């Protein structure tokens, strides 16, 4: 009885992670459940806001480079 129980436990220990990886790597499941849930919780930002943010970052970077160049010369 003890050996059979240990074999059963080992099969469960090995099968469960493999099954979880198999389920989570299904593209349809991932798209349907995970991506949709993410979009519900955090809707995508507006494209214009993202572009404005990138422009502000670019301007800051350029200003910093100009200041550094002026200090070094």
Swiss-Prot record:
Molecular functions per Gene Ontology: unfolded protein binding
Domain of life: Eukaryota
GO biological process, one term: mitochondrial cytochrome c oxidase assembly
Keyword terms, alphabetized: Disease variant, Membrane, Mitochondrion, Mitochondrion inner membrane, Primary mitochondrial disease, Transit peptide, Transmembrane, Transmembrane helix
Protein localization: Membrane; Mitochondrion; Mitochondrion inner membrane
Membrane association type: Single-pass membrane protein
Pfam family, one: Pet100
Alphabetized InterPro entries for the sequence: Pet100
Transmembrane segments: 7-24
GO cellular component, one term: mitochondrial inner membrane
Keyword field contains Mitochondrion: yes
Predominant subcellular localization, coarse grouping: membrane
Recorded disease: Mitochondrial complex IV deficiency, nuclear type 12: An autosomal recessive mitochondrial disorder with onset in early infancy. MC4DN12 features include poor overall growth, metabolic acidosis, profoundly delayed psychomotor development, seizures, hypotonia, and brain abnormalities. Death may occur in the first years of life. Serum lactate and creatine kinase levels are increased. Patient tissues show decreased levels and activity of mitochondrial respiratory complex IV.
Subunit annotation: Interacts with COX7A2.
Family under the similarity heading: Belongs to the PET100 family.
Purpose: Plays an essential role in mitochondrial complex IV maturation and assembly.
Name the record gives this protein: Protein PET100 homolog, mitochondrial
Taxonomic source organism: Homo sapiens
């Amino acid at each position: 009885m003890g050996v059979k129980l240990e074999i059963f436990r080992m099969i469960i220990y090995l099968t469960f992670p493999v099954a979880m990886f198999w389920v989570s790597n299904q593209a349809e499941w991932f798209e349907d459940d995970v991506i949709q849930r993410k979009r519900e919780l955090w809707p995508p930002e507006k494209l214009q806001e993202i572009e404005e943010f990138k422009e502000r970052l670019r301007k800051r970077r350029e200003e910093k480079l100009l200041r550094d160049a002026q200090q070094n010369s």
